[in-house]
Each structure stands twice: as C-alpha cells, then as structure tokens.
Amino acid sequence: MRARPETVCRLEPSRAKVQRVAMKTQTVSIAREGGIAIVTYDRGGRANAMSFAIMDELAAAALSFVDDNELRCVVLTGTDRIFSAGMDLSDPVFDQINEMSLQDKRHFSERGPRLGRAWAGIEVPVICAIEGPCLAGGLALASMCDFRVASQSARFGAPEVQVAHNMGWHSVPRLIALVGVQATRRVLLAGEEWTADEARRLGFADEVCEAGGALTAARRMADRIAGYPGLAVRMIKRQIDASAHALDYATSAYDKDQQLVAWMSEDFQAARAKFVR
C-alpha cells in the first residue's frame, strides 16, 4: 500500500511567499517557496537507499503536485553527500515477496515503474540536484527529471547487472534519449561510471557546479523557470515529452516482469544475501 504522508502545515501561496513544509514523512519532505517546490529525500546513512516503502513515499510526493496550478517548478534532491545508491537490497520485504502468489508478485513489482511514471508525469519542469553517488535506482529516478544539476562530487552508474537485476522503472529509453545507445550500453552492461564532467559531456547532466553547490544552482535555475508564464512552460514541456518520449512506456512495457524474473533468479538471491549478512 502507498505510504500516507503526514501533513505538517499548508499555507496558501497568496498568504506567504515561503511555505515552510508542505509535506513531510520520515524520509521525504516538500518545502514550498512560492511556485517552487523543493523535494528532499534523506533516509540517513551512507547509501540513501530506497526501500519499497520509501519508493511509495517518493511516488506520493510526485503525485501530490497533481492539480496544483500554483506550481511553477520542482527541485528534487538527496542529501549533501549522496543522491541515492538505488534500491535497498536488504529490505526484508524481499523475503515476503517470495511467499506471494504470482499475480501479487506482479502487482508488487509495479512499484518501480509507478515511481518513474509519477516523476516523469509532473506537469512542470523538474530539476534534479545531485551531490555524490547517483547509482542504480538513483540514476533511474534522475533520468525522469527534465534537468540534472551535478556537483563535482557526483558520480553516476548502474551496477544492476552485477547483482543480477534488470534496469527498470522505464529508465532505459530515457537514458538512451539523453546519452545515446552506446553510452547506455557502457553504463548498463560494461559497468562504466561517469564523473560530473563526463555526465555533462554525454548530455546527462545539464550543469556542473562546485561540490556542495548543486541545490543552490538548481534553485537558481528554478527561479528563472518560475519567472516565465506558467501555462506556456507546461505546454512546451508537454510538447517536448510527447515528441521525445512517445514510445517510452511501450518499449519498456516488460520492466516489471523482467524485474520479477530477476528477483526469482538464483543469481539475484545470492547477490542479495551479501547485503543482509
């Protein structure tokens, strides 16, 4: 089930320029500054990994912007040390999945693709501010955003193949659109990692800044976008997405089934066992 966010306070934009906290759960918070929403994901710990419950929280955060006509831009960020190392393979929910019926397993494996669609479907531009490692599911989530601002501390990779997992969440066609087929092959199949400068050269990162400055740079970009006519921005984003990503969901339709097959494989079980020792 989708996590129920705890609403701390909600102020109308006309009454306060800064809405201190519009939504807060244990790991995900949304702060409003006029028409800009800043979503912070901070689980604590070195990996900032995503459990299944946290994936639901992140999806709920994205869906909270539906019908928000005051919204002009969204900034998504992790901690000041790491964006995210991806899925938490030590999540005990994996053990429960083994006991589910096949239909329930397929339904459960929809969480990742649903998270990707929720962020890709936000009607206003989304800027991802990245410090430190952005790996696996972190890379997938970042690929759903419209812009990526990376600090010099950022590094990008997708070690899924090393743990016998597919690359899902509808992210493969997004990566291909951003960096091309061969760079996608290298990062997914050959274990290549990118520095911030390499990500900028390939087209994954739109801006590179000094370490610790990603959120500031992303907010500067958000301020610029928020100053443009909101309706025009929304229409142009929709035009771009319709042209660039028209077949994304068709070409990644088997994401959740591939994910399910991966979870049931002996190779994945062996790889996961190393995380839960």
Q: Language model features by range: what are they?
A:
Residues 39, 43, 57-58, 76, ...:
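Terminal peptide-recognition signature
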